[in-house]
Curated annotation (Swiss-Prot):
Amino acids binding shikimate: S14, L15, S16, T61, N85, D100, Y211
Pathway annotation from the record: Metabolic intermediate biosynthesis; chorismate biosynthesis; chorismate from D-erythrose 4-phosphate and phosphoenolpyruvate: step 4/7
Family: Belongs to the shikimate dehydrogenase family.
Species annotation: Haloarcula marismortui (strain ATCC 43049 / DSM 3752 / JCM 8966 / VKM B-1809) (Halobacterium marismortui)
InterPro entries from the UniProt entry: Aminoacid_DH-like_N_sf, NAD(P)-bd_dom_sf, SDH_C, Shikimate_DH, Shikimate_DH-bd_N, Shikimate_DH_fam, Shikm_DH/Glu-tRNA_Rdtase
Enzyme active site: K65 (proton acceptor)
Residues at which NADP(+) binds: G123, A124, G125, G126, A127, N146, R147, T148, E149, S150, K151, A209, G232
Subunit structure: Homodimer.
Any one GO biological process: chorismate biosynthetic process
EC numbers for this chain: 1.1.1.25
The protein's name in its UniProt record: Shikimate dehydrogenase (NADP(+))
Catalysed reactions listed for this entry: shikimate + NADP(+) = 3-dehydroshikimate + NADPH + H(+)
Length: 265
């Protein structure tokens, strides 16, 4: 039996177990997905313990995404982002990947969004870093808007063809943008949005990384403006799909995994 899992603290809320288990069931794989909740200062030790126990792959979530960098051989993208959310133990040395970046790209691609032009990323935290690098690697120009403009500037200095801005620049940035991705947690608060509704337009594709609630105020406003909308569960799904395919070497049964994920939202 192959064993995969998730380390984080806490992990009780995670939707990864049912999503991955649905994939194993659909393909008839002899595999299980389990959760581990080590102490908040023991991320690196947890990676070493998992390797000793013969775990085949791990997802990594808060607060360990940065802590485990020194315990794995990070892939180039994960190293640039400065965070690991997937570990593969099957190659002899634990290798760390960041599938959040790919998750955003594949979520947009699933909705037939053209990955070209200019993208505005709201938020310069962990999710914002991953999405900014992921979109830049697809060839988009990236405009990073953050409440603290200096943090947006610092991230833009690392990302190819990027610039940093304050949130007060959003309306101007979005006027000629093709893609908007919200990487802040603002949408989790009822009726809150980080983006002025009148800045949205029908030529935009809008992805909100928030998936609780599934239809945020931002997505409601975007739909009203005629924009293409992509909810955060698609990004969650595709970061998991990317890990699933890397671990198993199989094409993920995306529809089954998506169905199970949405049952648990």
């Amino acid at each position: 039996m192959d064993v995969y899992g998730l380390i984080g603290n806490p992990v009780g809320h995670s939707l990864s177990p049912p999503m991955h288990e649905a994939g194993y069931e659909a393909l008839g794989l002899d595999a299980r997905y389990v959760t581990f909740e080590p102490p908040a200062d023991a991320g690196a030790e947890a990676i070493e313990a998992a390797e000793t126990l013969g775990v085949d792959g791990l997802n990594v979530t808060i607060p360990f995404k940065q802590d485990v960098l020194d315990a794995v051989d990070p892939a180039p993208l994960a190293e640039r982002i400065g965070a690991v959310n997937t570990v593969d133990f099957t190659g002899g040395t634990p290798t760390g990947y960041n599938t959040d970046a790919v998750g955003a790209v594949r979520a947009l691609d699933h909705h037939d969004v053209s990955l070209s032009g200019t993208a505005v990323v709201v938020g310069a935290g962990g999710a914002g870093r991953a999405v900014a690098f992921g979109l830049a690697d697809e060839g988009l120009s990236v405009r990073i808007a953050n409440r603290t403009e200096s943090k947006a500037d610092a991230l833009a200095d690392e990302v190819p063809d990027a610039s940093g801005h304050g949130l007060d620049s959003l309306s101007d940035l979005l006027a000629n943008a093709d893609i908007l991705v919200n990487c802040t947690s603002v949408g989790m608060e009822e009726d809150k949005t980080p983006v002025p509704a009148d800045a949205l337009h029908s030529d935009l594709a809008v992805l909100d990384a928030v998936y609780t609630p599934i239809e945020t105020r931002l997505l409601q406003d975007a739909a009203a403006a005629g924009a293409t909308t992509v909810d955060g569960a698609w990004m969650l799904l595709y970061q998991g799909v990317e890990a699933f395919e890397r671990w198993t070497g199989e094409d993920a049964p995306v529809d089954r995994m998506n169905g199970r994920l949405r049952e648990h939202l």
